[in-house]
Amino acid sequence: DFNSPLTVEKDDWGLAFVNVLKTSAESASLYNLWYELPQEKRYSHTYGKKRSALDHIVIAKTLSDGKGIEYKKGTFTPFIVPYMLESDGVPKRWQISDKGKGKHLGEGFSDHLPLTAIFHTISE
């Protein structure tokens, strides 16, 4: 959870993730797995009506060289299950009591969707 958007838009705060680590679809050494998904699927967080990719899995390109540990291409995705979403598709946030010290009410999840990817070993 870097809390850094994938790209900078007019009203974004701070630097975009691609600027911080110099990642891109063409990067020589690092690859952000968001680039595997179409633009409209690149989100793990929703604030209001704005969807953004604040969470990232960045891999070294050596994880796709056919040696040792390997990223299984095409397996990256936000983990989305219905019980983790509100009826409008927004992640169901933790429910915190507004009384006292903000006690968790035992309902809801993070406001960020988890990211998943499959890695495996290559037998030599």
Q: What feature does the model see in each segment?
A:
Residues 3-124:
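Metal-dependent phosphoester-hydrolase catalytic domains
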